[in-house]
Amino acid sequence: MGNWVVNHWFSVLFLVVWLGLNVFLFVDAFLKYEKADKYYYTRKILGSTLACARASALCLNFNSTLILLPVCRNLLSFLRGTCSFCSRTLRKQLDHNLTFHKLVAYMICLHTAIHIIAHLFNFDCYSRSRQATDGSLASILSSLSHDEKKGGSWLNPIQSRNTTVEYVTFTSIAGLTGVIMTIALILMVTSATEFIRRSYFEVFWYTHHLFIFYILGLGIHGIGGIVRGQTEESMNESHPRKCAESFEMWDDRDSHCRRPKFEGHPPESWKWILAPVILYICERILRFYRSQQKVVITKVVMHPSKVLELQMNKRGFSMEVGQYIFVNCPSISLLEWHPFTLTSAPEEDFFSIHIRAAGDWTENLIRAFEQQYSPIPRIEVDGPFGTASEDVFQYEVAVLVGAGIGVTPFASILKSIWYKFQCADHNLKTKKIYFYWICRETGAFSWFNNLLTSLEQEMEELGKVGFLNYRLFLTGWDSNIVGHAALNFDKATDIVTGLKQKTSFGRPMWDNEFSTIATSHPKSVVGVFLCGPRTLAKSLRKCCHRYSSLDPRKVQFYFNKENF
């Protein structure tokens, strides 16, 4: 197990508490509607599906309260700042915000399915009870709607034998909002798959804004009061457990039982979602305000492999290493905002991003900046926002792993290190950095070469050659490149990058790398930072667990992954 417990105990505890609250709320609501005398007559028509529908509704309210919080980026950045002196275990939980957002969404889907299925049975029971002519208690209760609805005594929402379930579904507030919410939820979930987010980000972006219809629908879903229970006054006058068996004698002079009166369950969903909705509205207002501040593009560089570098200035902009921003180009799309990691260092007088062509929006943006005689497109920026990479200097030893354009957060870190060396910063806690960059194309290395060359020279001059150990891996090589590398193996610099460190072909042998690091730093706390695909994250996470020790006096690896 290695230090799996050390890395994940708080996450597991948090999930257990969240799941426990879901179970508690479901069971508590189920027993309430299954046992309470107030809903005795309602159960005579619907049975236990009433309790299932109401229990799932309560869990939907609870999870809908939580769903917006993990995507309040300014709130997370604020918490990250206030938790700067908290334990790394607690701070790491903020990096799992999107994972928790997805888990809450899955729970909403589960309870939505339970709620819909339960109400399908409920409407079927309502319909059959309304059609019944056998004089049973259910049929008598269903007929109360005929002439006493104005008095508040109706129980069955199907008001006549000619009314269909479909008609009630699309004409009642509960039915219509339920359909709208379900359609919005289905579209949001299906468009949030990794394939669509990676290949058709604009589809994901637009459909996810259907949450507005989901939240509005949830807020007014219960206004119609379709689920009804006996009023307190009516129960005091005619208790259901005493009077249900003598329903044929209701209102007889010689009987103490009177015809029951019912009232709708007051809407509660709006109470659950009000606070997070207000918080999210404030979040969006802040985003809008910051996005309207003028951004000045000071430099545009087109690197090989279709990588665009933008250097910008913005009044009041302050950043930390590894942070990211959201970028909008109104001339391409007014509503689309895309996240990009900052590649500049906090010590620089500008902030920069590197954009690789990966989809329609990025391709259009690069094409717009390639037009030499056209005016530079206007750019809007929101951020910056914090990520796991902010904590890199909290570790004695840091392992940085970037795949392709995923190297961008580490560009910021390495630049900041260069400036710290320039200023002789003695507060730098980090004593060793291992940097791995995995790329398919040789051209991708070019824009990073100058930085690595400068770092090599700076560390040589300061006598800190061993501070940075970097390895570049080329996965898209062919026999010509390998042959050329073999012929020039004795050269002092690499033929691909021009750096002193030779490029490796293929992928890293992570077990060997971690074993070497663990041996070299037997008593250190090692932070492993990744910006790359899920498969690579899985391999690195396993290695962190395998080569860590529960003994705090021995080496421990803490895995961190960029999520935005």
UniProtKB/Swiss-Prot annotation:
Gene name in the database record: NOX1
Carbohydrate-modified residues: 162, 236
Gene source species: Homo sapiens
UniProt xrefs under Gene3D superfamilies: Nucleotide-binding domain of ferredoxin-NADP reductase (FNR) module, Translation factors
A GO molecular-function annotation: NADP binding
TM annotation in the entry: 10-30, 45-72, 103-123, 169-189, 207-227, 397-417
Activity regulation comment: The oxidase activity is potentiated by NOXA1, NOXO1 and RAC1.
Name by which UniProt lists this protein: NADPH oxidase 1
Record's function text: NADPH oxidase that catalyzes the generation of superoxide from molecular oxygen utilizing NADPH as an electron donor.
